[in-house]
């Protein structure tokens, strides 16, 4: 699984703000990320979270803490 999909899966399953280290830990423990396939998992998680935040898919709550952004289409349902 790519870091983007792994991060979104963890944040969807947890449905709560998480520190990036917890997101990384859960993704590794659940087998979403393989440190042998993804070199430098830490950097991958951090840069992917920044990219997802700039796209509006995740929001930053505090330093290093992220949560899944509420989508406009989800709010209407």
Predicted regions and their residues:
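Phospho-regulated, low-complexity intrinsically disordered regions of nuclear gene-regulatory
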Residues: 1-13, 28-77
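Short capping segments at the starts of secondary-structure elements
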Residues: 11-21
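A short acidic, leucine-rich amphipathic alpha-helix
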Residues: 22-26
């Amino acid at each position: 699984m790519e870091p983007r999909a792994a991060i979104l899966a963890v944040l969807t399953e947890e449905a709560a703000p998480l520190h990036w280290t917890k997101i990384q830990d859960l993704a590794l423990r659940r087998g979403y990320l393989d440190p042998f396939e993804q070199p430098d998992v830490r950097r991958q998680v951090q840069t992917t979270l920044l990219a997802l935040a700039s796209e509006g898919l995740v929001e930053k709550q505090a330093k290093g803490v992220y949560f899944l952004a509420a989508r406009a289409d989800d709010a209407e349902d």
